[in-house]
Design a protein with these regions (language model features):
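A conserved ligand/cofactor-binding region detector
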Residues: 1-212
């Protein structure tokens, strides 16, 4: 953003006067393992190019808590560790809890005619709340500022007090844990049925919340 708005040099001079360097501050920000694949790079190029050309666009994705795993060699073996890109905070993201939407999973859809009106109702579903986090993108040489909306998932009620009071501590947090798993990890393993279901839930949450 500093580069796009022509503020890179002034920012560097101000930081120098304060005893810091822009390079050292930039080095502190972790390189998140998000969107590093071909499609991710292509999507970011679309956003950058459209904003630079003054087109009003909005991008959508999921606010993953962990990116692609980090790799380390330990005693000659490859080890995988979570990429906790949010451990230093998310100062670039603006959380909009008031704009959260409900996404319904599962259940049954009932259809009936009420006179000449066709009506539907969904029952037995699991409700998940999608909260938007907005990242603003400035255009190079343009006056446009567009946004990338990232969705995080949680339950409407994150704590089951009745289950906790019965001593069922795991169940008291189970539903919220299952909901938060949707936005937990980028590219979860899908070589088993639970992984396939999780990826489908991720895709459904992204489409439903973005359309809403």
């Amino acid at each position: 953003n500093l580069y796009n708005m022509g503020l890179l040099e002034p920012a560097g001079e101000i930081l120098h006067d304060l005893g810091f360097s822009l390079e050292s501050l930039c080095a502190l920000e972790p390189d998140a393992g998000l969107g590093n694949g071909g499609l991710g790079r292509l999507a970011s190029c679309y956003m950058d190019a459209a904003t630079g050309l003054n087109y009003p666009v909005t991008g959508f994705s999921i606010r993953y808590e962990f990116g692609i795993f980090r790799q380390k060699i330990v005693d000659g073996w490859q080890m995988e560790f979570p990429d906790n890109w949010l451990e230093m905070g998310d100062v670039w993201l603006h959380t909009r809890k008031d704009d959260a939407v409900e996404v319904r999973f599962g259940g049954q859809v009932h259809e009936w005619m009420d006179g000449d009106k066709f009506k539907t109702a969904q029952t037995g579903y699991q409700s998940v709340i999608a909260v938007p986090h907005e990242l603003y993108i400035s255009g190079y040489g343009s006056k446009a500022v567009n946004k990338l909306t990232l969705w995080s998932a949680s339950m409407p009620q994150s704590f089951d007090m009745n289950a906790f009071s019965r001593g069922d501590y795991v169940r008291a947090l189970e539903q919220n844990t299952m909901a938060e798993a949707i936005s937990k990890v980028l590219y979860p393993a899908d070589d088993h049925i639970n992984g396939k279901r999780l990826r489908l839930r991720q895709q459904y949450l992204l489409v439903s919340s973005s359309l809403q």
